[in-house]
């Protein structure tokens, strides 16, 4: 029996090589990428480059506006380096603009203008009164950006509100130096003999939608002195339940005693607003215990006598008479003792005659004259010598 041979199967042909080769070449070949050159010029702006001169793909460069220009809202200030080596498209984003509107002491911008930073020519902004101010209807609260990029002036269309008129301060005074409008300050003080309890000043400030004084007004309370001290051997007049400023009490002593010190003292106020008496109370001392002062006599060494002495008169003998010599008396005088100086008046006999030359028969006539004053200095020396010799 002859067996039949199985037919041989041919292997399947390999896949086409060209498409695979093409794909391999695409995967293995490097990608061609281009660098961007300097960023483009954009009107009214300048790029922020740093140290870079070439920029790789996807690099970004930002711009800032030149002086006098502002970035237009919602416009980008950035360009991007694309894969083709070109910069992304751009448009002018810097335009002329006024600076931010002026801040006013009496008004502020309305809310819709607070976040704006671009104000081209012709832009109008509106203000509203600040707290503490109220609007004056005839005046507008607007400003316009002018051609020369400055804002038109804004009239003072708001005026200050007024605080309530302060009432009188009992036993005190309210000083109002600048009025009672918003922002003003008033000061408080008390009359002598009263103490200020509370604030010494307050301001007119905003309270809700109106204005009012910051603090509650103070009060002036009367200052009292402590009870005056009593004294021994004496009494006090003017006692009361309380003692206020300038009130007086008077002391007197019992019989047989003498008052030493101020008879009256009064209630006064210290720098710290504390009541105190003007001085300590007096004392009463027994008369027998009061020291007596012995009189003192001052004897000056020089000077003229205080009481003139009566002149001494003696007769001068007629010519030819011999005076009887007198024994000098000795006087002891200390150098510091005051010795009165006497005046000596000598009577000189003068014989008078008639016009016919007749002699005087009626005795001698005497006249006062030739008064001799011995100076104190000479007398002092003489007396000292006499005392020394004896």
From Swiss-Prot:
The keyword Repeat applies. It comes from the Eukaryota. Residues 273-362 are annotated as: Disordered. Disulfide bonds join 36-81, 65-94, 98-145, 129-158, 163-204, 190-220, 225-267, 253-284. It is a lipid-anchor; GPI-anchor. The first Sushi domain (SCR1) is not necessary for function. SCR2 and SCR4 provide the proper conformation for the active site on SCR3. This is Complement decay-accelerating factor, GPI-anchored. It comes from Mus musculus (Mouse). The lineage of its organism: Eukaryota, Metazoa, Chordata, Craniata, Vertebrata.
